């Protein structure tokens, strides 16, 4: 009988030890892992070209005041999107760069104002940018109310014809146009779809 009691105590002690282990495991905190991502289309390389040469500036050279007033001074150039990976389309938006503004009263116009700091600075002169090789045809890329210009990418590249046209500032009169340096900086925002 003593052997049975001793065996019972050993089994009971082991059961308590085992229950104690399970209790410890039951109080261990668990961690959840949540992975969140947004799978997006690839992007493209972008560059501006004028006459098949890569440029960073669209240089009008010398322009005469009557050309500005008449709006007859324009330059064509291209935005090239290349090496596009899984990108069927994009939207271009043109916005004034830091330190640049829109033309018109209080900067409310749709052309890009002269932001030159040179002396003398051309007064009452602005530049329009158009989504075609010919100004005043196609879609104007507006300054104040920046609009999205859709581009379809076929294959891995696309050439987007654009043009810039010097004009009289929409908030000024012809007599306000003066000679001097002109510079207007803008930034293309490209959203891939």
Residue spans for each PLM region:
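Mature extracellular/passenger domains of Gram-negative fimbrial/pilin and adhesin proteins
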Residues: 2-5, 21-193
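Bacterial N-terminal signal peptides
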Residues: 9-18
């Amino acid at each position: 009988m003593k052997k049975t009691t001793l065996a019972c105590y050993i089994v009971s002690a082991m059961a308590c030890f085992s229950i104690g282990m399970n209790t410890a495991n039951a109080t261990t905190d668990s961690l959840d892992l949540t992975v969140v991502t947004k799978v997006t289309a690839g992007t493209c390389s972008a560059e501006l070209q004028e006459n098949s040469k890569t440029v960073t500036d669209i240089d009008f050279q010398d322009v005469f005041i009557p050309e500005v007033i008449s709006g007859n001074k324009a330059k064509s150039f291209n935005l090239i999107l290349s090496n596009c990976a899984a990108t069927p389309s994009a939207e271009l938006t043109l916005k004034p760069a830091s330190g640049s503004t829109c033309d018109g009263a209080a900067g409310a116009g749709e052309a890009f104002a002269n932001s030159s700091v040179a002396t003398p600075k051309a007064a009452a002169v602005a530049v329009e940018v158009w989504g075609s090789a010919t100004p005043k045809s196609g879609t104007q890329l507006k300054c104040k109310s920046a609009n999205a210009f859709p581009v379809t990418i076929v294959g891995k590249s696309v050439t987007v014809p654009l043009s810039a046209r010097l004009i009289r500032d929409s908030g000024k009169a012809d007599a306000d146009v003066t000679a001097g340096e002109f510079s207007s900086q803008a930034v293309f925002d490209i959203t891939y779809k």
